[in-house]
């Protein structure tokens, strides 16, 4: 699930800005289908970055113990991409698949960690997974079990230079968020560092700036521990935290129904929130940039797609324009969601199992009202101008493609698998 999408809430540790807006059991089978390119792809595009200062945090456990003799050079950035081992977790998720492809395109030696049954509801078997990740070394393992993951990496017989985490909880539920967005992601850090990794690229989300949801708390906790590791404990270790805005596919859910003549649904006047949506290809390219570009070392990197920020109203207008029809909107009062959430919260006090349903309601409410843009700490407002742009793919082109071809292959959810 892409949790920082625009659907168009718990106290949390939130790092205080310092300088803002600078220029299974072990599955022993290991299958290899690798054909990395020899060429280097390296860009020097600048982007807005954030750095934080924090109180000293409790160190991540196990990072300093049991360092393997299988180690890589700390100067991996001086190597040719074909000699750099990049471990990608969450490799079969929506963004993870594109990250693997982009890394292979740039010539890195990619190790893609996947489960034997991957995809939404585990619909993909090993053969399909190998096909999807062609060109990568596919390692079948389980990121939710640290000992299993470590054994898997040990069996590779070589070290790791960089870990790229594209893990995300399936649906943003309370238990799932802490299991995946925090624990499994931490496992990938611990295991990667044990086998020599010197850099960690984390796919996070721009919405963690205003943490009202459980998955945001889980992501922020890991972010803080990752930063503390690099900045306070181990100066030879670095990170890049990527916080994207909305993904194209998260905004495409209404294309088919509008195409069939139904109205475009939005909350309020359609101007409650805005985003600078980014395509999966462009985001994957930005994540790949973070492996070697030194201006992205130890940075929190919010990133959006090209062009202006778009409200739900404007997104709907673009869709009707492509279809050549007069806009037809259904405006839903956001107070309806507040009422439903209030009822679910009250029931959850008596029946805790309802808490998950209440959380899902809060997620929908959040995306209906909060912009996926940089939150300016000085004004307390979301800023289109301060949200950096990257890439070339536009939402209009995406909508046109979906109208022609449908949303096949664009299923959201279960980024973990």
From Swiss-Prot:
Tissue expression: Highly expressed in leaves, stems and flower buds. Detected in roots.
Keyword Ribonucleoprotein: no
Catalysed reactions, as listed in the record: protochlorophyllide a + NADP(+) = 3,8-divinyl protochlorophyllide a + NADPH + H(+)
Effect listed in the UniProt record for changing residue 333 to L: Decreased catalytic activity, accumulation of divinyl chlorophylls and pale green mutant
Source organism: Arabidopsis thaliana
Entry protein name: Divinyl chlorophyllide a 8-vinyl-reductase, chloroplastic
GO BP annotation list: chlorophyll biosynthetic process
Location(s) in or outside the cell: Plastid, Chloroplast
Keywords attached to this entry: Chlorophyll biosynthesis, Chloroplast, NADP, Oxidoreductase, Plastid, Transit peptide
Pathway: Porphyrin-containing compound metabolism; chlorophyll biosynthesis
Domain of life: Eukaryota
Gene Ontology terms: cellular component: chloroplast; chloroplast envelope; chloroplast thylakoid; plastid
pH-linked activity: Optimum pH is 7.0.
UniProt-listed Enzyme Commission number(s): 1.3.1.75
Null allele phenotype: Pale-green leaves with a reduced amount of chlorophylls a and b, and an accumulation of divinyl chlorophylls. Severe reduction of grana stacks in chloroplasts.
Gene Ontology MF annotations: 3,8-divinyl protochlorophyllide a 8-vinyl-reductase (NADPH) activity
Targeting signal (transit peptide) range: 1-49
SUPFAM superfamilies: NAD(P)-binding Rossmann-fold domains (SSF51735)
Keyword presence, Transit peptide: yes
Alphabetized InterPro entries for the sequence: DVR-like, NAD(P)-bd_dom, NAD(P)-bd_dom_sf
Catalytic temperature dependence: Optimum temperature is 30 degrees Celsius.
Summary of the function given for this chain in its UniProt record: Catalyzes the conversion of divinyl chlorophyllide to monovinyl chlorophyllide. Reduces the 8-vinyl group of the tetrapyrrole to an ethyl group using NADPH as the reductant. The best substrate is (3,8-divinyl)-chlorophyllide a (DV-Chlidea). Very low activity with (3,8-divinyl)-protochlorophyllide a (DV-Pchlidea) and (3,8-divinyl)-magnesium-protoporphyrin IX monomethyl ester (DV-MPE). No activity with (3,8-divinyl)-chlorophyllide b (DV-Chlideb), (3,8-divinyl)-magnesium-protoporphyrin IX (DV-Mg-Proto) and either (3,8-divinyl)-chlorophyll a (DV-Chla) or b (DV-Chlb).
């Amino acid at each position: 699930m892409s949790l920082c999408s625009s659907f168009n809430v718990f106290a949390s540790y939130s790092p205080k800005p310092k300088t803002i807006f600078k220029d299974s059991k072990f599955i022993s089978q290991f299958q290899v289908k690798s054909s990395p390119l020899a060429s280097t792809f390296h860009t020097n595009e600048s982007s807005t970055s954030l750095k934080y200062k924090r109180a000293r945090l409790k160190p991540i456990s196990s990072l300093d113990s049991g360092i393997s003799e299988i180690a890589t050079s700390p100067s991996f950035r001086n190597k040719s991409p074909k000699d750099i081992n990049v471990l990608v977790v969450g490799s079969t998720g929506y963004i993870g698949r594109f990250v693997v492809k982009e890394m292979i395109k740039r010539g890195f030696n990619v190790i893609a960690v996947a489960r034997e049954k991957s995809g939404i509801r585990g619909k993909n078997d090993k053969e399909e997974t190998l096909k999807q990740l062609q060109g990568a070394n596919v390692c079948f393992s389980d990121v939710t079990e640290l000992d299993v993951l470590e054994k898997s990496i040990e069996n590779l017989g070589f070290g790791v230079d960089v870990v790229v985490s594209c893990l995300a909880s399936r649906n943003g539920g309370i238990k799932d968020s802490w299991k995946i967005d925090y624990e499994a992601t931490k496992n990938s850090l611990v295991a990667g560092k044990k086998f020599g990794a010197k850099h960690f690229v984390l796919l996070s989300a721009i919405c963690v700036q205003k943490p009202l949801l459980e998955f945001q708390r889980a992501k922020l906790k890991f972010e803080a521990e990752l930063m503390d590791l690099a900045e306070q404990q181990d100066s030879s270790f670095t990170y890049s935290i990527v916080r994207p805005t909305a993904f194209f596919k998260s905004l495409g859910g209404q294309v088919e129904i509008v195409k069939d003549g139904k109205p475009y649904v939005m909350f309020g006047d359609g101007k409650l929130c805005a985003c600078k949506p980014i395509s999966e290809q462009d985001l994957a390219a930005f994540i790949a940039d973070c492996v070697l570009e030194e201006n992205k070392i130890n940075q929190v990197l919010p990133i959006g797609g090209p062009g202006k920020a778009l409200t739900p109203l404007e997104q709907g207008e673009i869709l009707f324009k492509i279809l050549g029809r007069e806009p037809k909107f259904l405006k839903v009062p956001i107070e309806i969601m507040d009422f439903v959430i209030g009822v679910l919260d009250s029931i959850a006090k008596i029946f805790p199992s309802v808490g998950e349903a209440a959380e899902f309601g809060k997620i929908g409410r959040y995306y209906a009202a909060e912009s996926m843009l940089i939150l300016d700490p000085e004004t307390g407002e979301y800023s289109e101008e301060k949200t950096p742009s990257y890439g070339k793919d536009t939402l209009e082109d995406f909508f046109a493609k979906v109208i022609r071809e449908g949303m096949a292959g664009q299923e959201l959810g279960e980024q973990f698998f």
